[in-house]
Design a protein with these regions (language model features):
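Short beta-strand/turn micro-motifs composed of small residues
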Residues: 71, 109, 139-141
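Glycine/threonine-rich flexible loop motifs
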Residues: 113-123
Length: 194
């Protein structure tokens, strides 16, 4: 069997195994967020950061949700990293944005963060701040053992089909899930061009 056949067979299996109920719960939560006038802050690193930037556009344009990501402000992101450190960059940004109980953060991550291994400490501190401020914590992650999956209010976990492809399939399914959300009849307010 070719690589492409195996890869796409894994993607097909993920579509079947992924919790559709959790995706619908997340759509409900995001609808509630919009109705109460809350803001959505998207956080991620690496490929997930790129996904955050794209998703902000979709949540704003298609769903009418006030959405932001610190990834989109390179000057502030790099200044905070340089001056205060990478581990606090997202929490400091959220603090400066006056994150509050009406708001939510949405984490895009493969592993979701791991305190013991010091993986994505910036996500961990952002989650801790959100919890302290009574903001909702949402996620789309590739591991159910990470900090996001354990601490989040509603977290979509991308099923692991092949350990060699956890990263590419997790990042790909971040896009699949957020596109499902922004086209959800409860959330979508504006039509796409195509």
């Amino acid at each position: 069997m070719s690589h492409a056949t195996q890869f796409f067979a894994s993607a097909e299996m993920i579509c079947k195994k992924l919790s559709h109920e959790t995706v619908d719960r997340l759509a409900d939560e995001l609808t509630d967020l919009r109705e109460r006038g809350g803001r959505l802050f998207l956080l991620g690193v690496g490929g997930s950061a790129g996904n955050c930037s794209h998703a902000v556009n979709d949540f704003r344009k298609l769903c009418g949700i006030e959405a932001y990501s610190p990834i989109d402000n390179v000057s502030e992101l790099t200044a905070r990293t340089n001056d205060e450190g990478w581990d606090t960059v997202f929490a400091a940004w959220l603090d400066g944005s006056r994150l509050n109980r009406n708001d939510a953060i949405l984490i895009f991550s493969v592993g979701g963060g791991d305190a013991e291994r010091n993986v994505s400490p910036n996500l961990l501190k952002a989650i801790d701040l959100a919890k302290k401020r009574s903001a909702k914590v949402f996620g789309i992650v590739g591991k159910d053992t990470g900090y996001t999956a354990k601490q989040g209010d509603v977290v979509v976990v991308v099923p692991q089909i092949n350990p060699a492809w956890v990263t590419p399939l997790s990042e790909a399914f971040q896009a699949v899930v957020w596109h499902c959300l922004v086209s959800h009849p409860k959330l979508q307010k504006n039509a796409t061009k195509w």
